């Protein structure tokens, strides 16, 4: 064989070995699926035999010279370009160019990459994937903008205490409140905290009716200023609830804020024995629906109407019970930093305690921390909470003018809790049998001057004065809800308890005085014993033994006989 043919054969073998080294080095970096397709390239003599054994899918030549082909040409050296086979050898897969890093895989340079992977690589490049060390794992990559948008859809309750509001969505520093997101975006204007609400929070689209699915409507039990109340049985637990449906759709911004305002008040008040319990709320068919506790005794207004028809009235003892229980509810509301501003008979509900089949053990009632838990009849504040506002940042909406305090009409909000006391005093007067209260006119002003309406029944002087003091023209002179809860007029047992407490404190003081005198006497006796003569007895009586030193100048006994001594 001549020299030219030998040189040509050696050159061809060198080219093949060079391709084999490149394919081996890249095979270690490629994914497992690319390792199978990128096998070592045989020499040209064995090309037909290897192709007969395995023929992978081929990309048409037009696709090879399409997307990404110019990048491959730029990365190849001039020597590699000379060794690249021509169009006639497109059946043999070429080795793709080595990627810049392990994390980047140029799918378009491999003729065996499906088009679906090519499209996914283009789409995924526009999204921000979560880091490997992230604690929150997602099945699908979610853009960062979506997470900010979902956080911004969380309403902030305006009645939530400021210290708690800063923490309730910032657990471990991972979540941000809606206000923080708004401050982070300088393009958005400042929005009042909690208002307006995001529209999508109040709408449920493409969903079955939750009201019809979860509840069985029994009857309509009331109609208020803001909605209609229905008695319903929940299909899951079989318990009875009061479901309130807003009268007007919440599509408008003002109606939407009003509906959310009532939900906010219900949610923050929580659970108290003298406040109707709130369970949940949702939007359905553009109406707000609130699930509350059901009170089987109806409203106080219904009971007053029945008494008026029958010519009866609540006795004074019952009136004191109503006043005391509602005062406890108002005390809880005022301590929560809010005022009701719509106290009236239609917003007070009655709950009769259900009798159990088994008798109640007396010890169980005695061990209760609160006396009202054993009461047979409970009075609770409920109704429309659309007028509830904050004491520190009031946004007052006037309630029923018949029970409205004059200072609210004059926009004097320095003593907002006392406006609830004024309305409660008139409510008890109506329950006592007073005629219907005027909405305006001379009689309206006469009551605001501190005069109770005419009450047909005779009340005790102390109770009458208490009611009169509750509607005092000066709100600062009215008692507080906490003061009413401690009133001796409403709780006569407190007087006896206070007397016993005073006697106990007096006896404790006497005992403490005696103990102090005893300690002083003991301290004075101890130094006297230390400085006394050791040879002299310190006690006049002979019961105390004396100490006598042995030896030295002490007298020694001269008789050791056991018999009788001689005279």
Swiss-Prot record:
Record-listed ATP binding positions: 221-229, 244
Region (Disordered): 1-103, 170-191, 502-567
Name the record gives this protein: Wee1-like protein kinase 2
Domain of life: Eukaryota
Extent of Polar residues compositional bias: 555-567
Similarity comment: family membership: Belongs to the protein kinase superfamily. Ser/Thr protein kinase family. WEE1 subfamily.
Class of this enzyme: transferase
Lineage of the organism: Eukaryota, Metazoa, Chordata, Craniata, Vertebrata
Modification type Phosphoserine: residues: 77
A GO cellular-component term linked to this record: nucleus
PANTHER family, sorted: EUKARYOTIC TRANSLATION INITIATION FACTOR 2-ALPHA KINASE EIF2-ALPHA KINASE -RELATED (PTHR11042), WEE1-LIKE PROTEIN KINASE 2 (PTHR11042:SF75)
């Amino acid at each position: 064989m001549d020299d030219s043919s030998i040189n040509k054969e050696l050159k061809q073998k060198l080219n093949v070995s060079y391709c084999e080294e490149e394919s081996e080095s890249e095979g270690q970096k490629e994914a497992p699926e690319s390792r199978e397709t990128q096998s070592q390239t045989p020499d040209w003599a064995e090309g037909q035999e290897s192709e007969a054994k395995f023929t992978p899918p081929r990309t048409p030549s037009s696709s090879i010279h399409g997307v990404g082909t110019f990048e491959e040409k730029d990365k190849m050296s001039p020597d590699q370009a000379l060794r690249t086979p021509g169009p006639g050898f497109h059946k043999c897969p070429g080795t793709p160019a080595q990627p810049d890093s392990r994390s980047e895989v140029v799918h378009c340079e491999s003729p065996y990459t499906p088009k679906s992977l090519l499209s996914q690589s283009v789409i995924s490049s526009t999204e921000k994937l979560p880091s490997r060390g992230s604690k929150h794992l997602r099945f699908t990559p979610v853009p960062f903008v979506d997470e900010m948008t979902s956080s911004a859809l969380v309403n902030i309750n305006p009645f939530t205490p400021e210290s708690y509001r800063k923490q309730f969505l910032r657990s471990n520093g991972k979540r941000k409140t809606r206000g923080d997101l708004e401050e982070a975006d300088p393009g958005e204007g400042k929005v009042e905290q909690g208002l307006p609400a995001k529209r999508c929070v109040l709408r449920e689209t493409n969903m079955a009716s939750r009201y019809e699915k979860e509840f069985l409507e029994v009857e309509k039990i009331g109609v208020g200023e803001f909605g209609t109340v229905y008695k319903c049985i929940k299909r899951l637990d079989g318990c009875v609830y009061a479901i309130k449906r807003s009268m007007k759709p919440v599509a408008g911004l003002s109606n939407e804020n009003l509906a959310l305002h009532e939900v906010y008040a219900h949610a923050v008040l929580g659970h108290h024995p003298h406040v109707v319990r709130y369970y949940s709320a949702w939007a359905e068919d553009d109406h707000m629906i609130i699930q509350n506790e059901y009170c089987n005794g109806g409203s106080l207004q219904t009971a007053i109407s029945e008494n008026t028809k029958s010519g009866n009235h609540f006795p004074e003892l019952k009136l004191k019970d109503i006043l005391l229980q509602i005062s406890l509810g108002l005390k809880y509301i005022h301590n929560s930093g809010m005022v009701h501003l719509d106290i009236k008979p239609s917003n007070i509900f009655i709950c009769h305690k259900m009798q159990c089949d088994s008798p109640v053990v007396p010890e169980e009632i005695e061990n209760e921390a609160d006396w009202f838990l054993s009461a047979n009849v409970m009075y609770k504040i409920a109704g429309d909470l659309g007028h509830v506002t904050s004491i520190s940042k009031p946004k007052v909406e006037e309630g029923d003018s018949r029970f409205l305090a004059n200072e609210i009409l004059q926009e004097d909000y320095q003593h907002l809790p006392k406006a609830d006391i004024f309305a409660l005093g008139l409510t008890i007067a109506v329950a006592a049998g007073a005629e219907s209260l005027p909405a305006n006119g001379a009689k309206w002003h006469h009551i605001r001057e501190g005069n109770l309406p005419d009450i047909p029944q005779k009340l005790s002087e102390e109770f009458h004065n208490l009611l009169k003091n509750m509607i005092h023209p000066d709100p600062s002179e009215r008692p507080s809800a906490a003061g009413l809860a401690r009133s001796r007029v409403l709780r006569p047992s407190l007087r006896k308890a206070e007397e016993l407490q005073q006697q106990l404190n007096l006896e404790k003081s006497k005992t403490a005085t005696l103990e102090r005198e005893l300690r002083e006497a003991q301290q004075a006796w101890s130094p006297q014993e230390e400085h006394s003569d050791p040879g002299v007895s310190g006690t006049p009586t002979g019961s105390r033994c004396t100490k006598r030193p042995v030896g030295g100048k002490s007298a020694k006994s001269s008789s050791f006989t056991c018999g009788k001594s001689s005279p």
